[in-house]
Amino acid sequence: MKDGLLRSLIYLATALTVSILFIIIGFILYKGVPGISVDFLTRSWDDKTTFVNVKADAGRTGEGDEGYIPALGITVKEGDKNLVISKIEKNSPAKKAVNMKNVSYVLKKDDTISKIGSDNTEDLSFKDAVKLLQSSNGTLRLKVTRPGGGIIPMFVSTIYIILLSLVVAGPIGISAAIYLNEYAKPGRVLNSIRFAIQNLAGIPSIIYGLFGMLLFVQTLKMQYSILAGSLTLSILLLPTIISTTEEALKEIPRSYREGSYGLGATKLQTIAKIILPGALPGILVAVILSIGRIVGESAALIFTAGTIAQIPEGLVGGKASAATLTTKMYWLIKESGDLSAASSIAVVLLVLIILLNVASKMITRAFLKRTGNG
């Protein structure tokens, strides 16, 4: 009777857990998948307005729709007060446009033209604006706005922060775990260190964010930057990496160490050739857990990396501030309540985590085969 009741409770708890998981994922997919498109994945988040120079080719001829501009190799349509590029020919001069710094700025479909020379398109009728473009010769200056709504800046920033955080926290955490398991003498000091590590794992991430802001952003003058955010996350990840790696090292049988010493290997050689390769699957778990923590973190990054949707142009400084996918999700819900866009970002996050985990396992498997441990 008691066994049957206990078994029923276990089944009920399992079914409830799995159901909640499927409901959450199903809701995210239902709300998010319709909003995912090529533009969503490849565009910048904010609209970008630029003045460009385009050299019209008067020798180009042809017929097309009402908004066809032969000299530029484009077709425009009427937008909201402006012209919208609807088609671009393969060899269009518009693909050779340059900005005011004489840097290539290829015009694309859906770009909006709001100014032709000194004339604002909103002050012209559609026909007059098209005639103005068709009658233009030589170099033509256009004010072009590229529509946003894409996640590419946040996606790139997320990858940068994942890599930087793991590069810093990985070696430090693994080295600390090796010391605690292989070198440190059992006693009060070791127990105190492990107790401190366990307590660090339980500190709210917003506390790490405040610490990172005070130390990296203000004291070390890094400003809001991906380096400040990555260093803050590195500190946050250390307890997870140390604890998980140490548990993996403990799983290596004592006989492996003794056999290596018996063959004349030093302790360092034993660690490098025997213990670490054997513990690699467990270390991989630490890396996967760390990736999940980084991708899901927002509080610490808001205080250190900032919330600007841009691709960082350095590690520190004004142009190094960047929002990750998670921080952008937070601001979307907070500022505009756009649940659909936030869900679309969540779908991308799920796919990103899966791909990174698969890549980690493939790299580990290849390493184990190469070293003869697979």
Feature roles, as predicted:
Residues 246-250, 254, 288, 330-374:
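C-terminal transmembrane helix and the adjacent membrane-cytosol boundary/short C-terminal tail
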Residues 108, 114-115, 124-147:
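PDZ-domain C-terminal substructure recognizer with occasional recognition of PDZ-binding tails
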Residues 56-115, 119-122:
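PDZ/PDZ-like domain segments forming the peptide/carboxylate-binding groove
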